[in-house]
Structures are given as structure tokens and as C-alpha cells.
């Protein structure tokens, strides 16, 4: 009976994991893009923007069409800092490309990771402009620049990239400000009204993107790709691409922020504090989706000047950086963009501990080993109770076999006799299940820490393990993990039933195959945990045997 329950528990644990991964996948946007040829984008009709006259408190989005290719008169302005290399088009003043210099495309490809792009898939572009009743540089504006390349100089902490637009006496200076050691970009519009009439308008910032093409991430990684909105009332909420298809969002909020999320990276739009902004979404042609925000109206009298500034964070979900940006701009909970699933409450302290250890040892693999040891120490007494119960079960196996043979034709009498034996020997038949029950939530939480934390992306361990976030290329760790499970089986009480015995013999091989697909960091944790468990179980088994002979 006890082995049946143990087998059932293990089976339920495996099924629970599979169901959890399936459930997580269902929570993500299921739609896959059907991408047309990019040249056809130019001819797409734009959805009409809603009327501004009815709601003058916040500007409405400039949501026309999709991203047009540069015309022949447009220039690409190249910008380089210590962390990013970007291209800004003079057509609309969009950030059309942005490479992350400290993050590789792949572990075996040193090319910088391209987060923003207007060529290839997925399309992801940052746009900013002005809208209003009078002249304003919107999506189709043509800006002038004094130079084609800007680079952050040694000893300088900021780099300004000005773009100039002028029409009918209204001059707009659009300035991108980049910073050293930062992925934060300020977007400032300076309006100089030399016209005879007063000028009124609003600033908008928006992100356009397509879903990732099918097959770009492994099946075991179901990280959310789509929009999100943070408000003081509802806190953090996701906006999937299917939500954008169903209805347009138009929501006024004070001191919020909006982000376009993907695995490991994101773009966040952060308004100035203390003002009410309108957040909006649009589903556009060519499987393109838009998430943006627009400011309250800016009034500039004739002969006067005014300006409006907002912020863009475009980079990796590095939690220290997100925390620093939040502190600098007085923004709440940017770290919520790092999604560890329903066990976030457990995953966050696990990541914190892992990060603190890595700061000391400077190796994420070693940090996983130390964290596993600390977890084992924390649950040492609980595990000891279970292992003592299993050791006692092992000791009474001959008596249990006699009971089974004596009452082979009367299952009720057999179970009653077994329970009396457990009571006499002070054995809890389910005691051996506790280590598994304890490890399941830790396992799931650590799984998401390893696959969702960009800090571990392409993080090397040693020897052949050069990326803890991807699977072992030679399957050595999964094979060692399977071998450790076989050793554990030898220490456990053997099942009496031959069918149960065969099932238990097969389980290590099933788990080995399963773990061949998991990140190497997770297998490293499980292998280390198994080795420590074997050592503890062997030690307790020897203690029980000595106490019996004393």
C-alpha cells in the first residue's frame, strides 16, 4: 500500500508539472503571426483616431497605419553608447533598430542581440511624436539632423541626439537623451511657437511589434509576449495580442506605466509623475500591435516656448537595473515585468538568494550549488524524519512480506495487519513522501527563475556547460541525475509487488529523458539535491541500523 501511494505521488508530481507547463502556455497569447511580405505594409489603410474634442484632458494616439519603410530622402542616424547601438530614422524620428552590446544573439553567436528592428521578424519599433490641432510632427514628419553619427565620448555621462522639424512658424526640437551604463532613454519635445496663433498639442510615445515567429523558443519556455499596463488601482496587468484584437484600449491613468514584454527583454514607457496620461492599444494590419501613451495637452502661446518629456527603457529585464530606474523616476514595481508565474512569492526570494551568492562567487553555476545546499540545510530536519521512516520501513520489510503472504486472499485483513504493524513500529507509511512534496514547489519556482531571469541567459558554469539557461548539449548532467535516482532507489524500501517494482525501476529512465530537455541549471540543482539527499539518507540509515544493534 505504501509503495502504491509513493508511486501515485510521483506520477501525480510528474503530471502536475506537465499540466502546469500546459496551463502556463494557455495563459500566453496563442495566436501565431501570419506574416505577409513587408513591402505590402506601405499600402495598408490606417484606422481612424478617435475624436480629441470630446476628451481634451489627454491627447489621443497617432495610431495611423504600420511602420513604413524609409523613403529615399530619409536618413538613418546612428547612435552608440557603452551598452547600446541604435538607428533613428529622420522619417518620423523613430528608433528603428537597437542592439544590446552586452547581450549576444545566441551562446554560440557573438552578434549583439537586436531588440528593436524594422527589418526581419519580429517587427519592434519605438515611436514618439506630437499631435495637435495645429502643425505637429507626427508619424510622417521629416526631421533634419546636423550629423549622421553620435557616440558617447569618454568622460561623458549623457549623449543628446537632436532632430529638428519646422512648419508654419512652429519649430520642434525632438531630443533623445542616452546615458552611460543605462538602457533608459529620455524623449523630449521642445516647441518654439513663432506663429501668430497659440499652439496646443500633446506628446505620444508608442511601441509597435509583431508576435514572435513560431518555433523561436523551446517548447518548455512559455514566457509571455505582449503588452502590460501598471496602474495605481489595478497594479500590474497583461494585455495579450488577442486582447488588442478584441477591443481597443483607451484608459486615462495617473502615475502608471506601460510595457511591451517578451522573453528576457522589454520596452517600458514611463511618463512624468503627477500627470494623467492616456494609455491605448491598437490592432493594426499585418499582425502588428501597438501599445502607447499620450500626455495631457501642452499649451504654447504665440511667441513662447514649451516642452514635454517622457522616458523609454529598452533593454534586458535585469532586476537591479529595473529597481534603479524605478527609484530614479519614482516608478512603482517595474520588477513585476519579470514574471515567475503563480509561485512568484517563492521564486523572488530564491532569485534574491541566488543573486547574492553569485555576487560573492562570480559564477551562477556555483551559486546554484550553494543555494541547493542552503535549501537542503533548511529542510534537513523534515527530510530526516522522512528518511528515518523509510529506514524503518526497510527494516520491517520481512514482516510485511509475511503479512502479505498470510492474508493474500483477504486484502482488508492484510491492510489492517499492516496498519497495526506500522503503529507498533511507530512508522508513518507516507513519511517518505515528504521530501518530494517539499521539493515540487521549489522545483517549479527555480525552473522559472532559471528560464525567465535574463541574468542567467548564456551564463556559463564550467567545462562543457556554457549556458545554464539551455539544456546540456551532451546530456551528461541528465545522465548523472538518472544515475543518482537509481542509487536513491537502492536506499528506499523495495516494493513487494513485482509490477510496482518494475515501475520504480523505469522511473529514473523516464525522468532522465524528461530532464534532457530542461535547462542545465535546473538539472544541476536536481542532481546536487539528489547527491545531498543520498548522503543524508545513507547517514540516517546507518544510524537506524546501529541503534537496532546496540
From Swiss-Prot:
Disulfide bonds: none annotated. Keywords: Cell inner membrane, Cell membrane, Chaperone, Membrane, Protein transport, Transmembrane, Transmembrane helix, Transport. One of its GO terms (cellular component) is plasma membrane. It is a multi-pass membrane protein. Residues 34-46 have a biased composition (Acidic residues). The chain crosses the membrane at residues 6-26, 341-361, 365-385, 431-451, 473-493, 506-526. GO terms for biological process: protein insertion into membrane; protein transport. It comes from the Bacteria. GO terms for molecular function: membrane insertase activity. CDD domains: 5TM_YidC_Alb3, EcYidC-like_peri. The keyword Hydrolase does not apply. Residues 31-74 are annotated as: Disordered. It is found in: Cell inner membrane. Its main location: membrane. Belongs to the OXA1/ALB3/YidC family. Type 1 subfamily. Required for the insertion and/or proper folding and/or complex formation of integral membrane proteins into the membrane. Involved in integration of membrane proteins that insert both dependently and independently of the Sec translocase complex, as well as at least some lipoproteins. Aids folding of multispanning membrane proteins. Interacts with the Sec translocase complex via SecD. Specifically interacts with transmembrane segments of nascent integral membrane proteins during membrane integration. This is Membrane protein insertase YidC. The lineage of its organism: Bacteria, Pseudomonadati, Pseudomonadota, Gammaproteobacteria, Chromatiales. The gene is yidC.
Amino acid at each position: 500500500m505504501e509503495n502504491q501511494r509513493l508511486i501515485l505521488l510521483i506520477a501525480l508530481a510528474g503530471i502536475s508539472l506537465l499540466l502546469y507547463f500546459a496551463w502556463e502556455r494557455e495563459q500566453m497569447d496563442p495566436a501565431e503571426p501570419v506574416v505577409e511580405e513587408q513591402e505590402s505594409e506601405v499600402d495598408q489603410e490606417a484606422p481612424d483616431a478617435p475624436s480629441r474634442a470630446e476628451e481634451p484632458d489627454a491627447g489621443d494616439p497617432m495610431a495611423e497605419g504600420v511602420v513604413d519603410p524609409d523613403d529615399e530622402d530619409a536618413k538613418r542616424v546612428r547612435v552608440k553608447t557603452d551598452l547600446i547601438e541604435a538607428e533613428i530614422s529622420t522619417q518620423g524620428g523613430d528608433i528603428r533598430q537597437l542592439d544590446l552590446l552586452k547581450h549576444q544573439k545566441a551562446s554560440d553567436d557573438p552578434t549583439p542581440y537586436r531588440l528593436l528592428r524594422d527589418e526581419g521578424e519580429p517587427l519592434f519599433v519605438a515611436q514618439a511624436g506630437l499631435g495637435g490641432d495645429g502643425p505637429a510632427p507626427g508619424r510622417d514628419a521629416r526631421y533634419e539632423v546636423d550629423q549622421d553619427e553620435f557616440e558617447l565620448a569618454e568622460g561623458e555621462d549623457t549623449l543628446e541626439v537632436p532632430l529638428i522639424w519646422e512648419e508654419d512658424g512652429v519649430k520642434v526640437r525632438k531630443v533623445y537623451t542616452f546615458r552611460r551604463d543605462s538602457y533608459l532613454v529620455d524623449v523630449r519635445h521642445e516647441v518654439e511657437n513663432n506663429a501668430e496663433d497659440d499652439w496646443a498639442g500633446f506628446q505620444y510615445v508608442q511601441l509597435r511589434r509583431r508576435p514572435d515567429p513560431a518555433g523561436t523558443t523551446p517548447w518548455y519556455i512559455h514566457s509571455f509576449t505582449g503588452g502590460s499596463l501598471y496602474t495605481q488601482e489595478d497594479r500590474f496587468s497583461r494585455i495579450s495580442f488577442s486582447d488588442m484584437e478584441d477591443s481597443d484600449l483607451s484608459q486615462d491613468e495617473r502615475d502608471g506605466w506601460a510595457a511591451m514584454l517578451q522573453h528576457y527583454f522589454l520596452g517600458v514607457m514611463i511618463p512624468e509623475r503627477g500627470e494623467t496620461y492616456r494609455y491605448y492599444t491598437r490592432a493594426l494590419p499585418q499582425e502588428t500591435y501597438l501599445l502607447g501613451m499620450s500626455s495631457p495637452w501642452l499649451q504654447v502661446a504665440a511667441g513662447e516656448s514649451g516642452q514635454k518629456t517622457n522616458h523609454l527603457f529598452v533593454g534586458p529585464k535585469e532586476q537591479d537595473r529595473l529597481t534603479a530606474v524605478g527609484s530614479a523616476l519614482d516608478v512603482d514595481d517595474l520588477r513585476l515585468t519579470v514574471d515567475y508565474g503563480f509561485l512568484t512569492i517563492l521564486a523572488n526570494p530564491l532569485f534574491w538568494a541566488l543573486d547574492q551568492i553569485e555576487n560573492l562567487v562570480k559564477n551562477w553555476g556555483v551559486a546554484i550549488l550553494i543555494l541547493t545546499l542552503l535549501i537542503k540545510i533548511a529542510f534537513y530536519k523534515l527530510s530526516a524524519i522522512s528518511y528515518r521512516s523509510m529506514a524503518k520501513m526497510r527494516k520491517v520489510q520481512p514482516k510485511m512480506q509475511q503479512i502479505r503472504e498470510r492474508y493474500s486472499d483477504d486484502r482488508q485483513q492484510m491492510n489492517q495487519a499492516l496498519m497495526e504493524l506500522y503503529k507498533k513500529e511507530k512508522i508513518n507509511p507516507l513519511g517518505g513522501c515528504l521530501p518530494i512534496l517539499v521539493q515540487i514547489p521549489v522545483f517549479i519556482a527555480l525552473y522559472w527563475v532559471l528560464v525567465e531571469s535574463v541574468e542567467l541567459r548564456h551564463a556559463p558554469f564550467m567545462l562543457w556547460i556554457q549556458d545554464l539557461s539551455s539544456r546540456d548539449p551532451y546530456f551528461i548532467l541528465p545522465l548523472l541525475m538518472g544515475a543518482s535516482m537509481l542509487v536513491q532507489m537502492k536506499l528506499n524500501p523495495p516494493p513487494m509487488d513485482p509490477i510496482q517494482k518494475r515501475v520504480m525501476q523505469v522511473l529514473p529512465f523516464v525522468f532522465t529523458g524528461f530532464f534532457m530537455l530542461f535547462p542545465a541549471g535546473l538539472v544541476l540543482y536536481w542532481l546536487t539535491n539528489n547527491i545531498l539527499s543520498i548522503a543524508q539518507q545513507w547517514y540516517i540509515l546507518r544510524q537506524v541500523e546501529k541503534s537496532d544493534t546496540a
